[in-house]
Amino acid sequence: MLTVEDILAILPHRPPFLLVDRILEIEDGLRAVGLKNVTMNEPFFVGHFPGRPVMPGVLIVEALAQVGAVIILRQPEYVGKIVMFAGIDDFRFKRPVTPGDTLKLEVSLDKMRRRIGKGQAKATVDGTVVAEGGLMFAIVD
């Protein structure tokens, strides 16, 4: 398990754009499961949407990408690098994520070639899939 302090030591992201609170499971270079506690205090709820707060889908994808970045950046050859989004494939959003939800963020890294990685990602709330699809990562200095 990785705490938020551990995550801050790995990722360059900082609040309010750090979207992972904890890593529950990790298999270095292969997969990880993260957690995001979604609270009413999230800055994006101010305008998305007044009176009916919904977490933007792109931020769910970003949270999943941050879990993927943790998988990559724990590998010795990539320590200190930055992982950027290179693409998303066939992403689907199944239901809204609202304040009080706990997002479980599951990412598997299927392929890593040079500085490009591909993987699969799934976000769930209480065991129900809320979003899933493919992610592509690029590693930069």
Curated annotation (Swiss-Prot):
Keywords from the UniProt entry: Cytoplasm, Lipid A biosynthesis, Lipid biosynthesis, Lipid metabolism, Lyase
What reactions does this protein catalyze? Answer: a (3R)-hydroxyacyl-[ACP] = a (2E)-enoyl-[ACP] + H2O
Q: Where in the cell is it found?
A: Cytoplasm
Where is the catalytic site? 48
Q: Which residues form a coiled coil?
A: none
Task: Say where the protein is mainly found.
Answer: cytoplasm
GO CC list: cytoplasm; membrane
Q: Which GO terms describe its molecular function?
A: (3R)-hydroxyacyl-[acyl-carrier-protein] dehydratase activity
Q: What is its EC number?
A: 4.2.1.59
GO annotation (BP), single = fatty acid biosynthetic process
At the top level, the lineage of the source is: Bacteria
InterPro entries in alphabetical order: FabA_FabZ, FabZ, HotDog_dom_sf
**Span of the secretion signal?**
none
Q: What class of enzyme is it?
A: lyase
Q: Does the keyword Transferase apply?
A: no
Q: SUPFAM superfamilies in the record, alphabetically? A: Thioesterase/thiol ester dehydrase-isomerase (SSF54637)
> Does the record bear Lyase in its keywords?
yes
Function text: Involved in unsaturated fatty acids biosynthesis. Catalyzes the dehydration of short chain beta-hydroxyacyl-ACPs and long chain saturated and unsaturated beta-hydroxyacyl-ACPs.
Family classification: Belongs to the thioester dehydratase family. FabZ subfamily.
Q: Record's NCBIfam families? A: fabZ, PRK00006.1
Q: What is this protein called?
A: 3-hydroxyacyl-[acyl-carrier-protein] dehydratase FabZ
Q: Which organism is it from?
A: Herpetosiphon aurantiacus (strain ATCC 23779 / DSM 785 / 114-95)
